[in-house]
Amino acid sequence: MSQYIGKTISLISVTDNRYVGLLEDIDSEKGTVTLKEVRCFGTEGRKNWGPEEIYPNPTVYNSVKFNGSEVKDLSILDANINDIQPVVPQMMPPASQFPPQQAQSPPQAQAQAHVQTNPQVPKPESNVPAAVAGYGVYTPTSTETATASMNDKSTPQDTNVNSQSRERGKNGENEPKYQRNKNRSSNRPPQSNRNFKVDIPNEDFDFQSNNAKFTKGDSTDVEKEKELESAVHKQDESDEQFYNKKSSFFDTISTSTETNTNMRWQEEKMLNVDTFGQASARPRFHSRGLGRGRGNYRGNRGNRGRGGQRGNYQNRNNYQNDSGAYQNQNDSYSRPANQFSQPPSNVEF
């Protein structure tokens, strides 16, 4: 490939931009192509002259390195590099209709320029450059110039500040107050607290007085140790008084193993009677279903209430003194009134 060094090369990138320059180096291992005296001719109608169309750039770059993945087409031209002109449309629109755009720069062009000669590229005074001889009206875009736009942002943009201030002056009434204050506060330099003062002592530090405080604390520790020793000594003297079994109350109580705690049920019954009364000695039957009996005596309604004992049979023997009649439900008969002035003797209450 050395026979092609110095030949005029026409290279079309994946973004449809055409670059023309002299072949400087080809690295087959890294897959790179290096051109010198490179000019960008733009897309030359490959975008159908629409809004994405990129127009020629008059800037000449000393050296540009292209990666193989960035190259779409490459051809060798026999013509002189100065005789090659970009393809421009016959009817160019006026310069006022083109949007403001940044100059198109080839990939890695700026890096190579800094390494070799660092050429100074003149910046246009207006957003739309004037017509270039042989190139027609040139209006580059900013969609494919990330590197150039970043470098432009690093320089102070006086024109953008003036335009923003004009727009802010027009729309000042509609702009929120907090945004105005935010813009003002962001431009102010940070202020330091000048009223802050540090108290600086005029005298030297007194080490003797501070050491005396520590020695005083040591004396208090000695006194505390003496108090603890005296308290321990008194406790030792009190331990000499042994336990007296004769005068102790708990030694007279017998243990459960010496006497038999199993009492007969008669003794337990008598103990319950003495403690809880006669009601505790009554037998308690809890068998249900064997029988049910009520023996009630009502005299003038209210002398006695319900009182009875549930036994093993069911029988009702009732005596009512209201009407003077004796009724026995088991006999199923009734006697005339006033026949008995007193209840019969055979009635059990």
Swiss-Prot record:
Main location: cytoplasm
InterPro entries: DFDF, FDF_dom, FFD_box, Lsm14-like_N, LSM_dom_sf, Sm, TFG_box
Keywords of the record: Acetylation, Cytoplasm, Methylation, Phosphoprotein, Translation regulation
Domain of life: Eukaryota
Residues passing through the membrane, by range: none
Domain DFDF: 193-229
Positions of short motif FFD box: 241-257
Start-end of Low complexity biased regions: 89-113, 311-321
Motif TFG box positions after renumbering to this chain: 260-280
Phosphothreonine found at: 139
GO cellular component, one term: P-body
Residue numbers bearing the Asymmetric dimethylarginine modification: 288, 294, 298, 306, 310
Region annotated Disordered, chain positions: 89-128, 144-239, 275-349
Residues carrying Omega-N-methylarginine: 306, 310
Polar residues: bias regions: 144-164, 186-195, 322-349
Domain spans labelled Sm: 1-80
Location relative to the cell: Cytoplasm, P-body; Cytoplasm, Stress granule
UniProt cross-references to Pfam families, sorted A to Z: LSM14 (PF12701)
Modified residues (N-acetylserine): 2
Gene Ontology BP, a term: stress granule assembly
UniProt-recorded Gene Ontology molecular function terms: eukaryotic initiation factor 4G binding; mRNA binding
Comp. bias intervals (Basic and acidic residues): 165-178, 215-236
Note: Present with 1280 molecules/cell in log phase SD medium.
Protein known as: Protein SCD6
Organism taxonomic ancestry: Eukaryota, Fungi, Dikarya, Ascomycota, Saccharomycotina
Encoding gene (name): SCD6
